[in-house]
A protein has these predicted regions:
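Subset-of-secretome marker
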Residues: 33, 37, 61-68, 72, ...
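Surface-exposed, polar helix/loop patches in the mature regions of secreted/periplasmic/lumenal proteins
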Residues: 92-160
C-alpha cells in the first residue's frame, strides 16, 4: 500500500512537471515579446532625450538677468508679469528638482512620479526600463531551468506585462509633456528674449 501511494505521488509529480514544460514555450514567447517592447521603448526614449537641458538653463538665466538689470518702470506691467510667470513655470517643468523623482506604491508596485519635470521624467522611464529588463532576464532563467513555483509562472508573466504596459504609458506621457513644454518654451523665450535685447539697446 505504501508503495502504491508513493507511485501515485510520483505520477502526480511527473504530470505536474510535464504540464509546466508544456507551458514553457508560451511563457518564453511572452517574455520575448516584452523584451521586444522594451527595446522599442529604449529607441523612442533615446530619440526624445533632451540633450540641450543645460543650454536652455543658461539661456533662460541670461534672459532673466537682462530683464532684471535693464527693465525699469514706474508702473506695473501686468502683461509682462504674466509672461514672466509663465516663463518661470515652464522652466520648472524642464529642470529636475533635486532629491525628487519616482517612488513606488508599496501595495500595487505602481511607479508614482513625484517630480513632473522633463529631466526627471527621462530618468524615471530610463531606470524603469533597465529594472524591467533585469527582472525579465531573471524570470526567463527561472522558467528555462524550472526554478521556483512553476504554478506561479503565468501569474508572474501577467504581472510583468502590466509593468511593461505602465512603462509604455509613462514613456508616452514623457514624450507628450516634453514636446509641449519645449514648444511653449520656444514661443515665450523668443518673445521675452527680443524684449530683453531691446531693453539693452536703449541703455
Amino acid at each position: 500500500m505504501k508503495n502504491f501511494s508513493l507511485f501515485i505521488l510520483l505520477a502526480f509529480a511527473l504530470l505536474f512537471a510535464s504540464c509546466g514544460d508544456l507551458d514553457k514555450p508560451k511563457h518564453l514567447k511572452a517574455i520575448a515579446q516584452m523584451d521586444k517592447s522594451l527595446d522599442s521603448m529604449h529607441i523612442v526614449l533615446k530619440e526624445n532625450r533632451l540633450d540641450t537641458l543645460a543650454g536652455i538653463q543658461i539661456a533662460a538665466n541670461a534672459l532673466l538677468t537682462r530683464i532684471k538689470t535693464y527693465y525699469v518702470s514706474d508702473t506695473i506691467d501686468m502683461e509682462l508679469g504674466k509672461k514672466m510667470n509663465q516663463f518661470k513655470r515652464i522652466m520648472k517643468s524642464i529642470k529636475p528638482k533635486k532629491g525628487r523623482g519616482a517612488n513606488k506604491n508599496a501595495e500595487s508596485n505602481e511607479i508614482i512620479i513625484t517630480d513632473r519635470s522633463i529631466g526627471n521624467g527621462f530618468a524615471v522611464v530610463h531606470n524603469g526600463l533597465k529594472a524591467e529588463e533585469e527582472t525579465l532576464i531573471a524570470l526567463k532563467r527561472d522558467i528555462e531551468n524550472g526554478n521556483g513555483r512553476r504554478d506561479k509562472y503565468a501569474e508572474y508573466i501577467k504581472f510583468e506585462q502590466q509593468k511593461v504596459y505602465q512603462l509604455q504609458q509613462l514613456l508616452k506621457a514623457y514624450v507628450d509633456h516634453k514636446n509641449k513644454t519645449i514648444k511653449d518654451f520656444n514661443e515665450i523665450y523668443a518673445e521675452l528674449n527680443a524684449f530683453s535685447l531691446k531693453l539693452m539697446e536703449k541703455k
